[in-house]
Curated annotation (Swiss-Prot):
Gene Ontology molecular function: plasmanylethanolamine desaturase activity
Effect of residue 95 to A: Loss of plasmanylethanolamine desaturase activity
Name under which the protein is recorded: Plasmanylethanolamine desaturase 1
Location of the protein in the cell: Endoplasmic reticulum membrane
EC numbers, comma separated: 1.14.19.77
Additional record remark: In human, PEDS1 and UBE2V1 are adjacent genes which can produce independent proteins and can also be fused to form a PEDS1-UBE2V1 hybrid protein.
Substitution effect: residue 214 to A: Loss of plasmanylethanolamine desaturase activity
Motif Histidine box-1 mapped to chain: 186-190
Pfam entry (one): Lipid_desat
Membrane topology term: Multi-pass membrane protein
Organism: Homo sapiens
C-alpha cells in the first residue's frame, strides 16, 4: 500500500485546554464522527457512478479515435490544454465552495458531498486510505451528464456533422477526463511512497498537481491554492486575490463567515 504524509498544517489557535485534548488525524474527534457518516447508500451511489462513467468514457473514446484526422491535430492540442486549464479552475471553484461555505448538516449535500471536505482538513491522510470507488465516485457522478450528451451525439449525428464538431468534442472529452480524475490526482498529491513512476513523473513535470505544491493549501485556515487538478492556476489566482475578493463579496452580501463550519469541525474535541 502506498504511504502518505503525516502532517496537518499549522495548529489552529485554540485555548490551552482544547489544544491539549485535540489530536489531528484519524483519532481526532471530528474526523471519527465524519468518517462514521459514510453510509451504505452513499457507497451504492459511488459504485453506480463509477460503472456508468467509465462505460461512457470507453464508448466515447472509441468514437473519437475512429473520427480522428491529422488535420485536426493543432485544434485538438489546443483543446487538450484548454480542457486542462478549465478543469483546474472548476476544481478550484468546487473545492473553494465546499471548503468555505455550507455545512455538514445541510439536507442531501451536507453528508454526501461537504462531509469529505471537512474530514480531509482534519485528517489529510484519510484520502489515501480510500479505495478507487470512494475516491472517484462523486466526480464520476458529476461528469455523467456531459458524457451522456456526447454519447447521444455519436449515436444520432451524421459523420459529416461529427467531423465538424470533432475539435470541440475533443476539448469536452479532455475536460471530462481531467474532471473525472481530479480527486484521484488529489489523492496522489497526498501519497508520498509507492506511487507508480509515471505518476511521479507527471507530478514532477507539473502536468498534474505536485505533492509539495498542494501542501500550501493544507496550512490552516486552508484559504488558498484550491485548484487540485493541475494546480496551474493556483499562483495567478492567489496573486490577484481571486478567492479572497470573492469571499469578501459573499460575506458582505450574506453576512456568512468563510470556513465557519470547517473551523467548527476542526475544534471538535469530543
Amino acid at each position: 500500500m502506498a504511504g502518505a504524509e503525516n502532517w496537518p498544517g499549522q495548529q489552529l489557535e485554540l485555548d490551552e485546554d482544547e489544544a491539549s485534548c485535540c489530536r489531528w488525524g484519524a483519532q481526532h474527534a471530528g474526523a471519527r464522527e465524519l468518517a462514521a457518516l459514510y453510509s451504505p447508500g452513499k457507497r451504492l451511489q459511488e459504485w453506480c457512478s463509477v460503472i456508468l462513467c467509465f462505460s461512457l468514457i470507453a464508448h466515447n473514446l472509441v468514437h473519437l479515435l475512429l473520427l480522428a484526422r491529422w488535420e485536426d491535430t493543432p485544434l485538438v492540442i489546443l483543446g487538450v490544454v484548454a480542457g486542462a486549464l478549465i478543469a483546474d479552475f472548476l476544481s478550484g471553484l468546487v473545492h473553494w465552495g465546499a471548503d468555505t461555505w455550507g455545512s455538514v448538516e445541510l439536507p442531501i449535500v451536507g453528508k454526501a458531498f461537504i462531509r469529505p471536505f471537512r474530514e480531509h482538513h482534519i485528517d489529510p491522510t484519510a484520502i489515501t486510505r480510500h479505495d478507487f470507488i470512494e475516491t472517484n465516485g462523486d466526480n464520476c457522478l458529476v461528469t455523467l451528464l456531459p458524457l451522456l450528451n456526447m454519447a447521444y451525439k455519436f449515436r444520432t449525428h451524421s459523420p459529416e456533422a461529427l467531423e465538424q464538431l470533432y475539435p470541440w468534442e475533443c476539448f469536452v472529452f479532455c475536460l471530462i477526463i481531467f474532471g473525472t480524475f481530479t480527486n484521484q490526482i488529489h489523492k496522489w498529491s497526498h501519497t508520498y511512497f509507492g506511487l507508480p513512476r509515471w505518476v511521479t513523473l507527471l507530478q514532477d513535470w507539473h502536468v498534474i498537481l505536485p505533492r509539495k505544491h498542494h501542501r500550501i493549501h493544507h496550512v490552516s485556515p486552508h484559504e488558498t491554492y484550491f485548484c487540485i487538478t493541475t494546480g496551474w492556476l493556483n499562483y495567478p489566482l492567489e496573486k490577484i486575490g481571486f478567492w479572497r475578493r470573492l469571499e469578501d463579496l459573499i460575506q458582505g452580501l450574506t453576512g456568512e463567515k468563510p470556513r465557519a463550519d470547517d473551523m467548527k469541525w476542526a475544534q471538535k474535541i469530543k
